[in-house]
Amino acid sequence: MDIRDLFFGDLPADRWPEQSSIKEVSGEPWESFIKSREFSTGGDNQSAKQCLHEILSMNNLESRHYLQAWTFLRTLGEQPPADEAKHLYGVVIEVALDEGVDVVAAYQDHTARYINHSGAGVVWEHPNDSLNE
């Protein structure tokens, strides 16, 4: 998987988390994403949706988790309410250069990602509110 694929919050359910990394992730929201996938694969879409709504009700998750939850709900036939559909969780900008493409993503949770055309990148995490001023 290309790291850029992780920026948009629109991966298919079998890639969030990747099957190969399930043993490496623990806690929420990962456990709920995995349970939702298992329910959906087993044909129990109502329980799958329930898990995803539980994720949406969790506080202080990365914006990308909320985006993924809505992506999965849409694949299960559920659309967000109008006010939620307009909620902006982040912005991804791709800039084409002669040398390649630079990509920057900024999210509502004050995190950001940057990939330079050279392949170098930056992951900006925001551990506290000290930079909000």
What are the roles of these predicted feature ranges?
Residues 120-132:
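Long, charged/polar, surface-exposed segments that mediate recognition or autoinhibition
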Residues 3-6, 11-17, 24-26, 31, ...:
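N-terminal domain-start interaction segment
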